[in-house]
């Protein structure tokens, strides 16, 4: 095999690896997709399912995290653990919950830190409380890439009121 073919194969191999490897932006978007999926509730769920979802949500939050939610449902939340506890309380009272993130904008503040803004919508229904509705908020978040496992996690989250629908 001549040198030109060998160099061509090497370049093609490097390009393929770089193309198949998920970018950091894609990995951060996946964190939001996972949060949306784990927050979703489509009816009654057992304790095992609820616990698994709580554990999956906790995995998305850095060990030391802060939250500013200023919300009538999720309030007095200062840490990731408190956030998961509050979310599980709300999930226990709701029949259906859907949370989605749109218009996600990511700005990297270094190799291991990213600032993210997004629009978040929440739809819910609780027959026990006689409540149902939709809400939209703006989310400002800082995500940090863990040094041990290279996973992106929420370090700081701030929800701002935008529009009630």
What is the meaning of each model-derived region?
Residues 36, 55-74:
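Short, solvent-exposed secondary-structure junction/capping segments
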Residues 35-43:
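N-terminal alpha-helical signal peptides/signal-anchor transmembrane segments
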Residues 45-52:
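Signal-transducing coiled-coil linker helices
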Residues 57-58, 65, 83, 116, ...:
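Hydrophobic pocket/interface hotspot
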Residues 22-36:
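Ser/Thr/Pro/Gly-rich low-complexity linker/stalk segments immediately outside membranes or between
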Residues 111-117, 127-165:
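Short beta-strand edge/turn micro-motifs at domain boundaries
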Residues 4-21:
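Hydrophobic membrane-insertion alpha-helices, especially the h-region
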Residues 22, 82-128:
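Surface-exposed, charged secondary-structure patches
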């Amino acid at each position: 095999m001549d040198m030109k073919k060998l160099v061509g194969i090497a370049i093609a191999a490097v390009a393929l690896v770089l193309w198949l490897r998920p970018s950091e932006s894609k990995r951060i978007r996946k964190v939001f997709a996972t949060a949306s999926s784990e927050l979703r509730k489509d009816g009654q769920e057992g304790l095992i399912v609820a616990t698994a979802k709580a554990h999956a949500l906790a995995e998305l939050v850095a060990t030391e995290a802060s939250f500013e939610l200023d919300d009538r449902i999720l309030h007095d939340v200062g840490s990731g653990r408190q956030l998961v506890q509050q979310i599980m309380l709300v999930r226990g009272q709701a029949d259906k919950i859907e949370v989605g993130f749109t218009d996600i904008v990511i700005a990297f503040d270094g190799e291991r830190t990213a600032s993210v803004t997004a629009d978040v919508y929440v739809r819910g229904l609780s027959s026990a409380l006689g409540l149902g509705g939709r809400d939209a908020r703006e989310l400002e978040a800082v995500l940090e890439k863990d040094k041990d496992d290279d996973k992106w996690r929420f370090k700081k989250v701030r929800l701002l009121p935008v529009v009630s629908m």
